Regions:
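The feature represents the first ordered module of a protein
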Residues: 51-88
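Acidic, proline/glycine-rich low-complexity IDRs
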Residues: 1-46, 69, 80-155
Length: 155
């Protein structure tokens, strides 16, 4: 059995280890993201568990993660990471080549429309596009080039 190294969370409440016993990790991530419907399943998060964590005993939270919200057809991706000074920063992930207009115009809704956010057109992902970013994060704990990050002001 493969050692479980990452935690996944659905809708901000249900979490457990990412497993590869049914599908390889890249396909497990893609399968989950493609099930997002914006209604009963509208958010998916992934983070690395601490090295010493026993995911059969405890499912720890983390200050660093990648998350998505929306549906398989249109979702937003965000990265939360700790910077060198220890401060937490959150970013919207975008595809390369997008234009940063003053006010984001694309609306991503989730939880039956109870929540929404506005993003730029290049910050809207399909489930298959998002799966590539999530799997890269799974491997490296980072969002790879050529994707771009736009910092969010959460305060």
């Amino acid at each position: 059995m493969t050692r479980r190294t990452h935690v996944v969370q659905s809708n901000g409440i249900s979490r457990g280890p990412l497993i590869d016993s049914v599908r390889p990790y890249p396909e497990a991530i893609r399968f989950a993201l493609n099930r997002m419907n914006g209604s009963s399943f509208w958010a998916y998060s992934l983070w690395r568990a601490p090295e010493e964590a026993d995911l059969l005993d405890d499912i720890p939270l983390s200050d660093e993660y990648i998350q998505s919200a929306g549906s398989a057809e249109a979702m937003t991706l965000e990265l939360r990471r700790l910077e060198a000074d220890g401060s937490a920063h959150q970013y919207v992930i975008g595809k390369p080549g997008g234009e940063q207009i003053a006010n984001p115009a694309e609306v991503i809704s989730w939880d039956d429309g109870r929540h929404s956010t506005r993003v730029h057109p290049h910050e809207v992902f399909t489930a298959d596009e998002a799966a590539e970013v999530f799997y890269a994060y799974f491997l490296t704990d980072a969002v790879p080039a050529p994707y771009v990050l736009r910092e969010l002001s959460l305060g």
